[in-house]
Amino acid sequence: MDGLRQRFERFLEQRNLATEALGALEAKTGVDKRYLATGAATLLSLYLLFGYGAPLLCSLIGFAYPAYASIKAIESPSKEDDTVWLTYWVVYGLFGLAEFFSDLLLSWFPFYYAGKCAFLLFCMAPGPWNGAHMLYHRIIRPLFLKHHEAVDSIVSDISGRALDVAAGMTKDAGKVSVNQLQKAK
């Protein structure tokens, strides 16, 4: 528990949007920012459990900060942070796809959105226990390496067919346009 408390304290000492807002609130109210942060986390957790807009809140938590961090990573000269956030987005996308197909089943689970939010926070957690990193290297990467050649072949075939269809439609549209112009004369 001390490790979690120390990480929490270190987070509150960093300079970012959340800690600046907490600092401003602390200055106005006189309440220590540790208590303000704990209260905000508690309210968010309760809202995820019982609130009306839990799906929206969960989606915002899973998207807003990672999108911001991804933009910062793109703008930084380091490649390592790019890899961290690309890994998160791969896991996020696969999770969203799985969630789409299992939505009817998942809607029966109480507190689903609290669990989903906890999972997404686990996936974006900094450090060696980053959930997206673990899922990618233990599950996604081995499956990808095993099947990527077959998938590449299928995608190449489909894109070739799509280009053929698009070329045919463009040719047909040109003929129709010429016919319409000739009829209009």
Curated annotation (Swiss-Prot):
One cellular component term from this protein's GO annotations in UniProt: endoplasmic reticulum
Family: Belongs to the DP1 family.
Localisation per UniProt entry: Endoplasmic reticulum membrane; Cytoplasmic vesicle, Clathrin-coated vesicle membrane
Function description: Required for correct function and survival of retinal photoreceptors. Required for retinal development. In rod photoreceptors, facilitates stability and/or trafficking of guanylate cyclases and is required to maintain endoplasmic reticulum and mitochondrial homeostasis. May play a role in clathrin-coated intracellular vesicle trafficking of proteins from the endoplasmic reticulum to the retinal rod plasma membrane.
Membrane topology: Multi-pass membrane protein
Stated name of the protein: Receptor expression-enhancing protein 6
Stretches that traverse the bilayer: 43-63, 89-109
Family matches, as Pfam families: TB2_DP1_HVA22
Organism: Bos taurus (Bovine)
